[in-house]
Design a protein with these regions (language model features):
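Conserved SAM-binding strand-loop segment of SAM-dependent methyltransferases
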Residues: 50-55
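Beta-strand-loop-alpha-helix segment that lines the small-molecule cofactor/substrate pocket
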Residues: 62, 66-67, 73-74, 78-126, ...
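NAD(P)-dinucleotide binding in Rossmann-like oxidoreductases
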Residues: 204-205, 211-217, 224-329
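C-terminal helix-rich "cap/oligomerization" subdomain common to oxidoreductases
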Residues: 67-69, 258, 293, 303, ...
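Predominantly a Rossmann-like dinucleotide-binding segment in NAD(P)-dependent oxidoreductases
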Residues: 12, 117, 125-241, 370
Length: 387
């Protein structure tokens, strides 16, 4: 399996490493990236590709690839996907698939022309043990009709400090924090509910990583705790509390789905004891879990009895790496899909990724306009492409 990459950052380096662990014949033969931040990790793992090209066109023109991995900054994804589709190459694109609504409609046009079979997406939570167990509970009707959900994704201060310094701090590059970081979660809960969001509302802003909150430092102390993740790269800066970022550092959203279910969602990027928790309440039972702490339980509504109890391991437990172990599970399924020529069904596709992205964008529109946003016209437009 011959692989090329456009954007060889730390994420794509780790994705390739996981694929290589599963399939020793997978070989990344070339990449395009003027500043390959994933190089250090790749060299340590002895997987750094030997050929570097100046452009994607040049690489696609000179190499016969079985897979193109797209790990470039979000606003570049559309251009790189288009070139991959036109070259008839199978694509793995990191989330979010594109960076704004205009790009979403352009991608829809591309998919209408070229088909969606050649695009695989990195919405990794769908591959997690939590997702697999929840799908089983739902298919067995243990939870009944999903009534309401509450969920959160919080990250540690050092991770928030990374967002304040990395290119992701600029909405023009990333599409915003809700899109960049939380489209995973929005997709996951749409999967659980089995319905599209129809109305969204949101509040949020930047109140933690601001100059007035710079910690008072004792002698010998410094702000390095906020720079623990120091793999920065393109367009990065050093400032954390005085960052020129235009993204939020906290946000809440409310979502109503077409089938009547509701979700309240909360994200904050300065949480020292981070968690990624959810409670799913149905007509017959409830499930609650935490990706970070690793647990998933379910209870019967009528009897109160626990009907499911599993601990998949803490995210900080030794050996539990890569999105709570889901990276390895994702790459195993994708490898099977590639080897079996798309006969292996995957739990998520490019249309799911587009929908999650659109919801994130509308959540931010609500935050910026101080209005509840109805999504019906948006879904009508997407459906008109018959994807």
């Amino acid at each position: 399996m011959k692989i090329g990459a456009v954007g060889f950052g730390n994420r794509i380096a780790h994705v390739y490493f996981e694929l290589k662990e599963i399939n020793k014949d997978a070989q990344m033969i070339a990449f395009v990236d003027p500043l390959p931040i994933g190089k250090k990790f790749a060299i340590e793992k002895n997987i750094f590709p030997s050929k570097q090209y100046n452009s994607l066109e040049e690489m696609l023109g000179k190499e016969e690839l079985d897979l193109l991995m797209i790990g470039s900054p979000n606003h570049m994804h559309l251009e790189h996907i288009q070139k991959g589709l036109e070259a008839n190459v199978k694509i793995f694109a990191e989330k979010p698939i594109v960076a704004n609504e205009e790009q979403t409609w352009k991608l829809a046009e591309l998919i209408k022309k070229h088909g969606k079979e050649n695009i695989l997406v990195g919405l990794v939570l769908r591959y997690s043990k939590h997702a697999r167990s929840l799908r089983k509970l739902i298919s067995e009707d243990k939870l009944g009709e999903i009534i309401s959900l509450e969920a959160s994704e919080h990250i540690m201060p050092w991770h928030g400090g990374f967002f304040m310094r990395n290119w992701r701090r600029k909405t023009s590059y990333s599409g915003g924090f809700m899109l960049e970081k939380c489209c995973h979660d929005l997709d996951f809960y749409s999967m659980v509910v089995g319905s599209r969001p129809i109305r969204v509302g949101s509040f949020g802003g930047r109140r933690s990583f601001v100059p007035e909150n710079i910690p008072e430092l004792s002698k010998g102390d410094n702000l390095d705790v906020y720079k623990e993740y120091n793999i920065l790269g393109w367009e990065s800066k050093e400032e954390v509390f005085e960052s020129d970022a235009d993204i939020v550092d906290h946000q809440v959203a409310i979502v109503e789905y077409e089938n009547g279910a509701t979700l309240s969602f909360h994200t904050n990027m300065k949480v020292p004891d981070e968690f990624r928790r959810f409670a799913i309440i149905g007509s017959k039972g409830m499930a609650e879990g935490d990706f970070v702490r690793g647990f998933l339980t379910a209870h019967d509504s009528h009897t109160g009895k626990k009907i499911f109890d599993e601990n998949f391991g803490s995210a900080f437990q030794q050996g539990t790496k890569g999105h709570y172990g889901a990276d390895r599970m994702m790459l195993k399924d994708i490898n099977d899909n590639l080897i079996n020529n798309s006969k292996q069904t995957l739990p998520v596709g490019v249309l799911d990724c587009m929908e999650a992205g659109l919801v994130a964008m509308k959540i931010d529109e609500s935050r910026l306009t101080n209005q509840i946003i109805n999504l019906k016209n948006m879904w009508d437009k997407l459906d008109s492409y018959n994807l």
